[in-house]
Amino acid sequence: MCYRETGDARYLARAVKSAEYILNHPNLPKDGVPYWDFDRPGEERDASAGAVIASGLLELSEYVPHEQSRRYVRAARRILRSLSSDRYLNAAGSAHGFLLSHSVGHKPKGSQVDVPIIYADYYFLEALLRYRQLD
């Protein structure tokens, strides 16, 4: 978003560096939905982080060379498929209307751990819309 609004190449470089860090992290699960902390594999997954990553990758794919763009779109699609599975997506009419379960807000304080969180739904819908609008 910073690059889109400013055109400052430093923002694009930082976004690419962040994306590469995430996608190449040895503790990133195969389905693309990260643990609440990359340094704590095997603990709770964080659907909200997955949704943010998917949305960010799809936006970033608009500003990078074609091959890199394809890689980011594939990674975002993998995350969206995972989040759309029964593991993360709540059944209609359940979970008080939340779309996604299994998000983490503040694990060190024991707050919002393995629960639905509204911003997870927001970024999930944003990512789905971005994916749908791909050329």
Language-model features, listed with the residues they occupy:
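Glycan-recognition and catalytic cores of secretory/periplasmic carbohydrate-active enzymes
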Residues: M1-D135
